[in-house]
Amino acid sequence: MKRPTSSSRKSKKQGEDLAFSEEGSLPAVTMEQKDEAEMEEVDEEEEEEVDEDMAGGHAAQSPSPSCGLGEKKRRLALEQVRALERSFDTDNKLDPDRKARIARDLGLQPRQVAVWFQNRRARWKTKQLERDFAALRARHDALRADCDALRRDKDALAAEIRELREKLPTKPADTAASVKVEAGNDAAAGAAAATVCKDGSSDDSDSSVVFNDEASPYSGAAFIGFGPSFLVDDASAATVGCSSSLPALESKWHGPYSDDSCKGGVYGFTEEWLAACSGEMAGNDAAGFFSDEHASNLNFGWCASGNEGWE
């Protein structure tokens, strides 16, 4: 440890003078504080001397500082770097055996090879991330352009739909509704009429067969004639939904008699037809039609023979 210098002695004397002069008003500096101040000054001086010695030693070892910096930066030769690059392209993972073999072939230490591979993997990952980011960015831009185009198409179609709705009138909708209601009513009426016709025609099916048969005594061939008031049209009967008690005679209906005994052309029945009707239809309700009670209501007469007149 060196002796205190002149500067330290002067500061010590100034401190003592300050302590004695301000003894009444300010506290005096203690001995411990003085010792600490002296030790700090000594340490600063020693550090300065050590720095100077180190600077001189470095200058002696390396006369030119630029040469020292160049040696630190250039640790691997160009051939060594190329060989390491080829090894990295083959496999970026480094196991202990491979590390020792590469270090022996290139004349390097295994630690240097491991550090170089580690740094190279870090750079490779960075470049890979940059490539992936560029690809994703391009894809994002393409998708965004497609989205913008689709949005424009959507807006155009929406505007066109609005224009068409404005041009579309509202009256045809009401007309279509009324047409549907009328069609429904017509369909209901047609179904009801079909049901009535079916129910009415089922009861008279047997009688229609009997009257339409030519071999039957009740067929149109056996009729001589009815008055016009007793004729019923087939079409009108089908429309009303019921069948007539007397069949339509169609072409088998005979015209008015031209008998001389009959005064004027009249319609009537023959005796044979009346006799057949009274015999065959004795137990039928239709026989009441030819009874004596209703004879006065019939607007026709019949001729018993050609020589007799009207009764």
Swiss-Prot record:
Pfam families per the UniProt record, alphabetical: HALZ (PF02183), Homeodomain (PF00046)
SMART domains membership: HOX
DNA-binding region: 69-128
Ranges of compositional bias, category Acidic residues: 35-54
GO terms, molecular function: DNA-binding transcription factor activity, RNA polymerase II-specific; sequence-specific DNA binding
Cellular component aspect of the GO annotation: nucleus
Main location: nucleus
Known tissue expression: Expressed in seedlings, roots, stems, leaf sheaths and blades and panicles.
Keywords: DNA-binding, Homeobox, Nucleus, Transcription, Transcription regulation
Region annotated Disordered, chain positions: 1-74
Region (Leucine-zipper): 127-171
One BP term from GO: positive regulation of DNA-templated transcription
Localization per Swiss-Prot or TrEMBL: Nucleus
Keyword Nucleus: yes
Family: Belongs to the HD-ZIP homeobox family. Class I subfamily.
Protein role: Probable transcription factor.
Protein name per UniProt: Homeobox-leucine zipper protein HOX13
Organism: Oryza sativa subsp. japonica (Rice)
